[in-house]
Regions:
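Conserved non-catalytic scaffold segment of RNase H-like nuclease domains
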Residues: 1-122, 194
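Substrate-recognition/cap helix-loop segment adjacent to the acidic, metal-dependent catalytic center
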Residues: 127-155
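A structural motif
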Residues: 171-183
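Short, polar/flexible loop-turn hinges at active-site or ligand-entry regions and domain interfaces
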Residues: 77-83, 142-147, 188-193, 217
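A short acidic (Asp/Glu
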Residues: 9-12, 129-134, 206-207
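Short alpha-helix plus adjacent loop in nuclease-associated cores
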Residues: 158-173
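Acidic two-metal-ion nuclease catalytic site recognized across multiple nuclease folds
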Residues: 183-185, 194-228
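Short, solvent-exposed loop/turn segments at secondary-structure junctions
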Residues: 124-127, 163
Length: 228
């Protein structure tokens, strides 16, 4: 999953787009028709009045210009689209319902917190998961006992950036493991990059490639008693 946001600080920014796909952990492929995409009105605009391109809550940053450059439109179009987005609470409920429908049950199993989807994405531990916990606490899906969200698997997370770091750490020509650089190195088309729909599809494809690689190696490496 991936957020597009109105800022770079995960402790304060608001999401404006949230996209996701589901990867089948056994077939190692994107589940058919699992694509999900919603937009969310940012908190700064929820109660703002008289907002215009010359009078808005983002005058202290270039975030509107940045999103405009990514989408190839004027910043005023970005602002106007954000104003039209549905309330974050409603969009968040849709995402919760979406994840509920993808719990993984083993034979005879019951729905528990451990059957919930495993969160995965690029740099999610440092960024996206912090936003998830904030939204869960504000709108629903928060576990007070665990002090975190209850919509994803409580223990397991797969941050693709960490996988990339481990595999690419000793390749000198790779100077950065940003998603854009990794896309370029792997030969992934960057058209529409930084749109959440595009980013989650690319991340899912990269994750699947690494999972298949791990599966292939795991069957060939002698782990048992290897420290004896």
């Amino acid at each position: 999953f991936d957020f597009e946001t109105d800022g770079s600080d995960p402790t304060t920014c608001s999401p404006v787009q949230l996209s996701s796909v589901i990867v089948d952990p056994y077939k190692l492929e994107i589940v058919k028709d699992s694509e999900f995409n919603i937009y969310l009105k940012p908190e700064k605009l929820e109660k703002a009045k008289g907002v215009t391109i010359d009078n808005h809550p983002y005058t202290d940053s270039d975030i509107l210009e940045w999103h405009g450059k990514v989408k190839g439109v004027d910043k005023s179009e970005i602002l106007n689209s954000w104003l039209e987005y549905p309330d974050a609470k409603l969009s968040w409920k849709q995402f919760m319902d979406y994840l509920e429908s993808y719990h993984l049950f083993r034979s005879g199993g019951k729905k528990t917190k451990f059957s919930a989807p495993i969160a995965s994405g690029y740099n999610i531990i440092s960024f996206d998961m912090k936003i998830v916990d904030r939204l869960a606490k504000k709108y629903g899906g928060y576990d007070k006992k665990e002090k975190g969200n209850s919509i994803f698997h409580p223990r397991d997370k797969i941050d693709i950036m960490n996988l990339v770091y481990i595999w690419f750490r000793f390749i000198p020509e790779i100077k950065s493991i940003s998603l854009d650089n990794v896309r370029g190195y792997l030969g992934v088309d960057a058209t529409n990059a930084h749109d959440a729909v595009k980013d989650v599809k690319d991340c899912a494809d990269i994750l699947i490639r690494f999972l298949k690689l791990h599966k292939n190696f795991a069957s060939k490496v002698q782990f048992k008693d290897s420290f004896r």
